[in-house]
From Swiss-Prot:
Part of the 50S ribosomal subunit; part of the 5S rRNA/L5/L18/L25 subcomplex. Contacts the 5S rRNA. Binds to the 5S rRNA independently of L5 and L18. It comes from Roseobacter denitrificans (strain ATCC 33942 / OCh 114). NCBIfam families: bL25_bact_ctc, PRK05618.1-2. Signal peptide: none annotated. The lineage of its organism: Bacteria, Pseudomonadati, Pseudomonadota, Alphaproteobacteria, Rhodobacterales. The gene is rplY. This is one of the proteins that binds to the 5S RNA in the ribosome where it forms part of the central protuberance. CDD domains: Ribosomal_L25_TL5_CTC. GO terms for cellular component: cytosolic large ribosomal subunit. This is Large ribosomal subunit protein bL25. GO terms for molecular function: 5S rRNA binding; structural constituent of ribosome. Keywords: Ribonucleoprotein, Ribosomal protein, RNA-binding, rRNA-binding. Residues 1-24, 189-212 are annotated as: Disordered. GO terms for biological process: translation. Residues 194-212 have a biased composition (Acidic residues). It holds the Pfam family Ribosomal_L25p.
Length: 212
C-alpha cells in the first residue's frame, strides 16, 4: 500500500504559451500545468533531471505527490499526462491534477506475480502469460496501492486467474464489471503441436478404417 506521500518541487512559470514553454526547455525545465480542485490552473516548470529520475523510478502516473511551489500552499497531485518528443521520447510537457485524500480516481496499477517457484504447471513446462501487466482500478487518492499481487502457486496447465480471484486493496475495485482474465498458464508450444498431431493421426486412422 502507499506509504508517505513524496514531495515534488516545482516552480511557478510566469509566462504562458508556446514561447514560454520553449524557453523553459532551453533552461533545462519541463513545462507543465496543475489543474482541478475548483482552483485556477497553475503553470509550472519542473527541472528536467528531477523529472527524468522520477519517471525512471517507475509508476510515476500512479503515485500521489505532495507538490510544493513557492508562494502557494502544498497540494496533492497526480500525473494525468506526460507528452514526449516524437523522436527522442523525452518529456516535453506534463499535466497534474489536484486531489483530496478522499478523491476517487481511475488508475492503472501494476500486477506482480508470486508463487512462480512452486507452481505445478510451470514445473511441468507450462508457460505463464500475463495478459494484463496492469489493471485499471478505482482507488482512493490517499491510499493508492503500489501494485496488486496474483498468486500462481497452485496453477496447473490450462488454469487462469481472473480479477474476481485477486485480493484487491481495501476500497479499490475494477473499472470493468466483467470478470476478465489477468494471467493464464498454457501448455508449451511443442506439447500443443504433439497433441494436435496425435489427434490428426487418430482421425486419419479412423478414416482409413472406415474406407476398408
Amino acid at each position: 500500500m502507499a506509504g508517505e506521500i513524496p514531495d515534488l518541487v516545482a516552480q511557478e512559470r510566469t509566462g504562458t504559451g508556446k514561447g514560454a514553454a520553449r524557453q523553459a526547455r532551453r533552461d533545462g525545465m519541463v513545462p507543465g500545468i496543475v489543474f482541478g480542485g475548483d482552483v485556477d490552473p497553475l503553470p509550472i516548470n519542473i527541472p528536467f533531471n528531477v523529472l527524468i529520475k522520477k519517471l525512471r523510478e517507475g509508476r510515476f502516473k500512479s503515485t500521489l505527490f505532495n507538490m510544493k511551489v513557492e508562494g502557494h500552499d502544498d497540494v496533492r497531485v497526480i500525473c494525468r499526462d506526460v507528452q514526449r518528443h516524437v523522436v527522442k521520447d523525452l518529456p516535453t510537457h506534463i499535466d497534474f491534477m489536484r486531489l483530496k485524500r478522499t478523491t476517487k480516481i481511475n488508475l492503472f496499477i501494476a500486477v506482480e506475480v508470486e508463487g512462480e517457484d512452486v507452481a505445478p504447471g510451470l514445473k511441468k513446462g507450462g508457460v505463464l502469460t500475463l495478459i494484463r501487466p496492469e489493471v485499471e482500478l478505482i482507488v482512493t487518492a490517499g491510499d493508492i496501492p503500489d501494485h496488486v499481487t496474483i498468486d500462481i502457486s497452485e496453477m496447473e496447465i490450462g488454469d487462469n486467474i481472473t480479477i474476481s480471484s485477486v485480493n484487491l486493496p481495501e476500497g479499490a475495485k475494477p473499472t470493468i464489471d466483467r470478470d476478465f482474465v489477468i494471467a493464464q498458464l498454457s501448455a508449451p508450444a511443442g506439447l500443443v503441436s504433439s497433441d494436435d498431431e496425435e489427434e490428426e493421426d487418430g482421425a486419419e486412422e479412423a478414416i482409413e478404417a472406415t474406407e476398408e
